[in-house]
Amino acid sequence: MSWNIAKRDEPWRELVKMDADVALLQEACSPPDDIASHVDTGPRDHWDSHAWNSAKGLYDRWPMVVKLSDRIEVEWFKQVGPISDTGEDEIAVSGIGTIAAARIIPRDTTTPRFIVVSMYARWIRPHLSTSTKWRVGYADGSAHRIISDLSAFIGSTDPETHRILAAGDLNTIYGATDDNPLALPARDRTITDRMDALGLAFLGPQHPPGRQARPVPQGLPPDTRNVPTYHTTRQSPATAQNQLDFAFASRGFDRSVSVRAMNAVDEWGASDHCRVLIEVAG
């Protein structure tokens, strides 16, 4: 599953109650003491960008790959700076607080191992020289850094040569029309285009399943299949409008992967983002 937990404690407690094997988290801090022994967040250098960046005050929440069951083994990739050659257990990272990666080895020997990537496209503020009116900035820059980093696991134009599952909060609105006031549609489209060029298929989540916002939110086409995965402080799960969370998988491997937004009001969870349930069948 994938979930932006907004640096909150209660989502951790909800995680341990689920029958999940692994969680791809975004904006996570350390788990609360009362459940820390029930989750395995792996070595700190797989998620904490301070391991390779000396500016200790830059960030306080992270993407993580968290082991939740003994049905799998997890081999976490250590973050290193943006270098061209890495070790077998390393991933070169170009953004702070944007990515965590690991290899998942199911104990069920019928399911081949695969790589998971937790993605968080942080907002970036334009340079002061732009005199921008954008209040929060842009997220596509972080998304492209993530794509550059995960592309290290791709060494062929044939997508059958890799098994990658990437999911998380990209802070973009899929399929937004050019009049959408909350998006940069032309720039955002380059994210899915580039994923597709790498052989990573878009999985959604899309309706059906998942609850759609009604009426259709401003800035989306009438036939949108988007499902809201995020609500603002002025909204609730019942009034959530926009989908910011997405999943991708290597083409071919994607046929074994299903995704669903757990966005019904009674299953949303204790974050401003809902959970995205991801099931790998083989």
Annotate the PLM regions:
Residues S2-I5, E14-A36, V116, D149-D178, ...:
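Active-site beta-strand/loop signature of hydrolases that rely on acidic residues for catalysis
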Residues A28-I124:
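Structured beta-strand-rich core segments of catalytic domains in phosphoester-bond hydrolases
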Residues D9-P11, P31-D34, I124-L128, I173-T177, ...:
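Short catalytic/ligand-binding loop motif for oxyanion handling, primarily in non-cytosolic enzymes
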Residues G57-V80, I105, A213-S256, V280-A281:
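Conserved beta strand-loop-helix elements of the APE1-like EEP
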Residues R255-D266:
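Low-complexity, intrinsically disordered Gly/Pro/Thr-rich segments
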Residues M1-A6, P112-V136:
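Active-site-proximal beta-strand elements of phosphoester/diester hydrolases
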Residues S54, R234-P237, A264-G269:
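Short proline/glycine-enriched turn/loop segments at secondary-structure junctions
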Residues T41-G42, V136-A247:
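Metal-dependent phosphoesterases centered on the DNase I-like endonuclease/exonuclease/phosphatase
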